[in-house]
Amino acid sequence: ISRAQKNGEDSQKYSSKAIDYANLAMSTVIPYDSNELKGVWIRPTYYDKKSIEDVLDRLCDSGINNVFIETYYHGKTIFPSQTMEKYGFIKQYEDYAGFDPLRIWINEAHRRGIKVHIWFQTFYVGNKSPDTNPQYILAVHPEWANYQKKNADSDTIAYSVSEHNGYFIDPANPQVQNFLYELLSEIIERYQPDGINLDYIRYPQSLSPIYPNYDMSNWGYTSFARNEFKDMYGVDPIELKTTDPLWGYWKMYRSTKVTNFVRKAGMLCRAKNVMLTAVIFPNRASAMDTKLQDWKNWSANNFVDGFTPLFLTCDDKTAINLMEEVLRNKSASTKLYAGLFVTFMNGSNSDLIKQIHAARRYSLSGLIIFDYAHLNDTYVSTLTESVFRPIKKEYVIQESDIQKTNGTVQFKTKERARDRRK
């Protein structure tokens, strides 16, 4: 210690070793759970069978047992879709032309005992202007576009500045709901996936109610919604302010449109024995106020089988608070799968382990890593120490492993292998 205090390099070196040993110890004491869903979200940017097989082999070796394949995103499908073609939209992502990656993902995953969930961007259609391709969804159906109050009468289709300049379609429009329902039905009928994971199952994000321009930042001011609401309540919602008695009804009108789609998707999935999960924002008040996502209602009515909230933090205490928020507001029948963002945020191995430990302490039903592109070998190694696979090795530091050289304590690590779980 005295040497380390005098020598900065020694101090840094021994501190680093101490952290390494602490991380190793932490990863080996977290119990393995054979019943737990261990998943990862994947944007499938792989264009041949061998590449897909290599990814699945790597995941299988790391203990992953569920994959969430981004199948419908930015308003396009990775597979050749009859529904997309029927509506006059782009039949398939151009990069996959002549190739059906979804079929390969599902077949090869199942060969390895891995379940496949369809990651589905419900009301989000990407951030490319509709003007750039006549077959984009909002180029074919501009009347499906969602609008904020501040630009409700604009001739230009609105995008959400706070969400990567992305475009959204209108949950209130029955044509939108019918299209999305048909697309989900096609996927389920043709591919028999194990699950559907609804993402962007909400309105675009508005400001928080604490800001004076909250009402102007709200979304949902489409021609269809305004006319329907006026028929129901006798007032155009664009005339409402947050202090008006009917503001709560306008808020409920929009959140109910999202809930209705979740309900229909739940009925579809249940009839086909397909698991339905939804990506939610764990802070319930914020989810309702800024995204009109009434996930407590979905859970209370058993419209979904589980939630996959993203915990957008590397801090385990923040993640724990968010886990507790969801646990307080969901029903017992709705499973909770922790969506861990640590790898995407380039957090430390210990950050990842602490959040996994917290999820298991609260007896959550599983963990999902966001996302595969950021799941580097260091993280995989951490998971395979035991967190995602049964422990087969022990790392024991004994007195004989400690040697003293010139008054300096050093460790000689010994690996003692024995099967701890038969």
Positions of predicted regions on the chain:
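Mature N-terminal, pre-catalytic/accessory segment of carbohydrate-active enzymes
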Residues: 1-65, 69, 409-411, 415-421
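Aromatic- and glycine-enriched glycan-recognition loops and surfaces
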Residues: 46-62, 89-112, 256-263
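Aromatic- and acidic-residue-enriched segments that line the glycan-binding/catalytic groove
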Residues: 79-90, 124-160, 200-240
